[in-house]
Amino acid sequence: MRAGDALPPLEVPVTRTLIVAGAVASRDYQDVHHDAEAAREKGSPDVFMNILTTNGLVGRYVTDHFGPRAVLRKVAIRLGAPNHPGDTMTLTGTVAEVADGPEGAVTALVRITGANGLGRHVTGTVTVEVPR
């Protein structure tokens, strides 16, 4: 692994089930994540994904690439355009920094972007530790 290495893109179909299940699993009962009418009343065209679901998808993207022994040490994300049902979010990432980690592991800083039909849904960085 080297700085500049790109992770392969991951396309995530944004379904109503994913949005609602992610909200319920993270105990986020805000109506905008499960009630389309309430979301419309608050100015959104439909329900939208919460940050905890996005955070989980970003973590999955990184660990799927680096393997089951990879450990996420820090996830720092910022949301932008909402993820609505029927869209697709494409996650992309680039290794920005690589350093020696504890006990012979390698620590990498990965820059992440998740884009959908409206623009950038998520941007941020993930620090991941990978055994050699």
Residue ranges and their predicted role:
Residues V62-L91:
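Mid-chain, well-packed structural core segment of small domains
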Residues M1-L7, P85-R132:
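HotDog/MaoC-like acyl-thioester-processing domains
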Residues V12, P82, D100:
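Residues that form or immediately flank small-molecule/cofactor binding pockets and catalytic motifs
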